[in-house]
């Protein structure tokens, strides 16, 4: 089973994730990804078109890097893919400054994987996000979007 770490501590129970704020929603998604290998595989396949071994995936929640912000989620298997997810509540998309900071984070830059992506998650449809996200690619890293509706469909 994948490992879920929040604030440096392993999350072992869904009850650690109760709440309805933006961060609570993100924690719940992270927990579901870590505990449901088929859901994790479906999400990775959706955004990267990759078949993965869920056993080898690490999911990090609220990962801090000095001068580069705090990511909502970072998901990697350290061999084929590295994803940074920025989740928003409502019809909101991450801005250019936030995406630029994430594209410069040490972990994604130094990762030897061949598939990297920054993913926006919100209630915005994919069509809306494709029209209004500030970048399609930043620092050679593709920027994509998954709506909460699509996440629900994948689950």
Task: Give residue spans per PLM region.
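Nuclease-adjacent, charged terminal/linker segments that flank catalytic cores
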Residues: 1-11, 23, 46
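Acidic metal-coordinating catalytic centers involved in nucleic-acid phosphodiester chemistry
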Residues: 2, 6, 66-69, 75-155
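Generic low-complexity, intrinsically disordered sequence content enriched
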Residues: 8, 18-21, 125
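Glycine- and acidic
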Residues: 10-15, 86-87
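Acidic-basic catalytic patches of nuclease active cores, encompassing PD-(D/E)XK
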Residues: 15-56
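Active-site metal-binding core of divalent-cation-utilizing nuclease and nuclease-like domains
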Residues: 46-78
């Amino acid at each position: 089973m994948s490992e879920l770490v929040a604030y440096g501590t392993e999350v072992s129970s869904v009850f650690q994730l109760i709440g309805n704020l933006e961060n609570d929603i993100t924690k719940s998604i992270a927990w579901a990804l870590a505990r449901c290998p088929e859901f994790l595989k479906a999400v990775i396949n959706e955004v990267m078109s990759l078949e993965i071994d869920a056993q080898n995936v690490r999911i990090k929640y609220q990962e801090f890097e000095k001068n580069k912000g705090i990511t909502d989620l970072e998901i990697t298997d350290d061999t084929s893919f590295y994803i940074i997810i920025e989740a928003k509540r409502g019809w909101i998309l991450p801005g250019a400054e936030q995406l630029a900071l994430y594209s410069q984070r040490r972990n994604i830059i130094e990762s030897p994987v061949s598939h990297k992506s920054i993913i926006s998650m919100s209630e915005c449809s994919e069509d809306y996000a494709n029209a209004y996200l500030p970048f399609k690619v930043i620092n050679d890293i593709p920027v994509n979007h998954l709506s909460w509706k699509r996440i629900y469909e994948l689950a």
